Structures are given as structure tokens and as C-alpha cells.
Amino acid sequence: MNIYYKNFKKYDTKIYNIIKKEIIRQEEHIELIASENYASKYVMQMQGSLLTNKYAEGYPKNRYYRGCKYIDEIEDLAIKRAKKLFNVDYVNVQPHSGSQANFAVYSALLNPGDLVLGMKLNHGGHLTHGSKANFSGKMYKFISYGVNGEGKLDYNKLLNLANYYRPKMIVGGFSSYSGFINWKKMRFISDKVGAYLFADISHVAGLIVAGIYPNAIPYAHVVTTTTHKTLSGPRGGLILAKEGDDEFYKKLDSAVFPGTQGGPLMHIIAAKAVAFKEAMTLKFKKYQHQLVKNSKSMVEIFLKRKFHVVSGGTKNHLFILNLSNIGLKGDLASEILEKANITVNKNSIPNDKLNPKITSGIRIGTPAITKRGFKEIESKKVAEWICDILENINDKKLINNIKIKVINLCYKYPVYKSFK
């Protein structure tokens, strides 16, 4: 607990004890939620810095408050590093989250009620890609596209939808799709109907900068991403663009501030700058390659054990297990796995007949386990344990024995050594 002030335990024992329990949970659980990762100590130090004190509405050299000389330097550095990392002309580092970044893009380029194509939520899309429960589906008219019977993105169907509806924007990206996206085809379809191509690369940004996932940036008019997930930075958002004009970039900036946000979170922007520096290293690229290897090695075990993997495999850091063929629901599966200290999330499958609170599947991702040092051997072992549990959900002794094995494995690969 040495990242906390020595006297904090005395000052607020309740919060201290809760955080201590969460540290133990993170250390003793195998984290397989695809959107979660472990930030470095350097990133966390920035998030806990005195930069949280400074209000800085506006942009560098154009603030509404005084005292921003060094704040400007930090934001400029974050922008400079992001431009280099992603090879882009435009960056906005201020969005508080991926959803905020997406909202800003919609606000900049659309009017309420405009027609947009987005990936269907239970086919792998995200809430902000047109879900009726989300602002995107309430403010704009979304038509959903999805995957074919093999679980692959159906570009022919997308083209037909685009030709029929003539949308103002097509959104590409996902939260639970295990394949590649052909951005060139996406741009072709967008150009065919005169639509903006907006790419949300939140899940695969780390893979893209490492050169192992198709890059959306040369094809999309605008790109957003989160800065955690595979990028392994602080929780936050980012807007990127290349080869646009000043007017286009001003629209995006204005949509963030003053359009959808007030003051930026400078402690988070500093943490983003640190994460961008980390992402430029050879170590980071090796990490990205390993997390895909780990994902594929887990799929290999599930297929060997006759489990149904949506789309038949994975080309990135995640995949979906369809549990309907074994009569198991996603919410129950995730609950039982948690008893063995294995954390996954319930997830809808394409054309799921169950509602999103129950689901027919679970999503599995490898960013966190890879960050703590797991390689193919450990990943396969974890996959075997998951299979054993899902095939024997009422065997409490087996589940407890696997829990002990999980804890022992976790302590061989600590997340943060100094927290023990």
C-alpha cells in the first residue's frame, strides 16, 4: 500500500480497508474482462498528482483561466506524443471517456435525427453505436448492420443498407467482435453514399499501433479510442484524424469544448501522455503480440473441448463463447467462474434470444492476464479450468480446487509487486 500516504489509514480507515481488499482481489483473480487492463505505476502516479487541482477550460494558449502555463505544456506534450504514436495530423486529448469522445464526434458532424449505420449491439457493437438505451440511439436514427451466419462482418449487407438508407455517417468498430475489420471496404461503402466514416478503435488501439491489426486511420474521416483497454493507460478518451482541413478539426474541438465538456482533467491528460510514451516502446509492441497469441491459444483449447466460439476463432484480444449449446446462460456462467476467482463478463451472442441482463454467452479477453506475464502455457491452463468449471457447474469441490490453483498462479505473476 506504499502508493498511499502513510497517515491515510488513520484518516479514513473505511476507504483504506476497502481499497486494500480491492488490491487483494486484483492480485488473486484472473482478469479476463476484455476492456480491463492494469495501468503502470507511472500512469497511476499522474492520476494522483496535484494536476487534479487545476481548472483549464479551453485549449493550449487559449484558456479561460490564468495560471495555465505548465498545463499548456502538458497538454501540448500529450498531443505531440499521440500524433507521433498514431501518425495523425489532429488529436484531441480532452474527452473524459470513449463515450464522451463518440458523443463529441456525433455532435460535430451530425444533426439530431440524422441517419447513421452502426454495428448491432448483440452482433458485437457498442452502446454508443446506436443502442436505443443510449444517447446515440435516442438523438439519431440508427440502422444496424451486423455479422453473417458465420459470425463475420457482412459487408454486402452493409453496402445494401447504405445504398438503401443513404446515411450521413457509418460507424465502424466494436466491443465484442473477434475478427478483423476491412477499413478499405468500409471507406468504399461510405464514399459510395457520401457518408462520413467514423471508426471507434477503442478495443484495438494498442494492436493498431503495434502493427498487428488493420489500421482505420488512413481510411476513416475521424477516429476515436479509449486510452485504457489494449493501450493500458488511464481511463479516458481520444479523438484522432488525418488529412482533414482546419474547419473540420475546429468542429471536432468545439464539439468537445464547449460543446460537451467543461474543464479537462489535467491529471488524466498527463497520465495519457505517459501512456503514449509507454506505447512507443518495443516492450509494448511485444506485449501486444503476446496478448493475441494468448487469445488464440485459449480459443484453441475451447474448440478442442467442443465449446462454440462465435465466428470460429479470434484475430485480436477477445472472443465470445456461445454457451447456448450446453444450456448455460452467460450471467450464471460468469457468476460461477467468479467463485473460482476467474472474472469474465456475460455477453450477448449474434441474434441472442435472451435479454442483455442474462445473455447466451460470455466474453473473454487477454489484455490483463498478458500484462501480468501470462503466456500461452498459462493461458491454455486457464482455458482448461474454465472448461472444467462450465462442464461441472454444481461441483463445489472442483470449483474450490481450481480457485486455489488460480490464486497460486496469480502470486507467481503479481500485478504490482510492491502491493503485496
Curated annotation (Swiss-Prot):
InterPro entries listed in its UniProt record: PyrdxlP-dep_Trfase (IPR015424), PyrdxlP-dep_Trfase_major (IPR015421), PyrdxlP-dep_Trfase_small (IPR015422), Ser_HO-MeTrfase (IPR001085), Ser_HO-MeTrfase-like (IPR049943), Ser_HO-MeTrfase_PLP_BS (IPR019798), SHMT-like_dom (IPR039429)
First-listed, main subcellular location of the protein, grouped into a coarse class: cytoplasm
Reaction(s) catalysed by this chain's protein: (6R)-5,10-methylene-5,6,7,8-tetrahydrofolate + glycine + H2O = (6S)-5,6,7,8-tetrahydrofolate + L-serine
HAMAP family according to UniProt: SHMT
Stated name of the protein: Serine hydroxymethyltransferase
PROSITE patterns, alphabetized: SHMT (PS00096)
Keyword Protein biosynthesis appears in the UniProt entry: no
Gene it is expressed from: glyA
Organism: Wigglesworthia glossinidia brevipalpis
NCBIfam families named among the record's database cross-references: PRK00011.1
Entry GO CC: cytosol
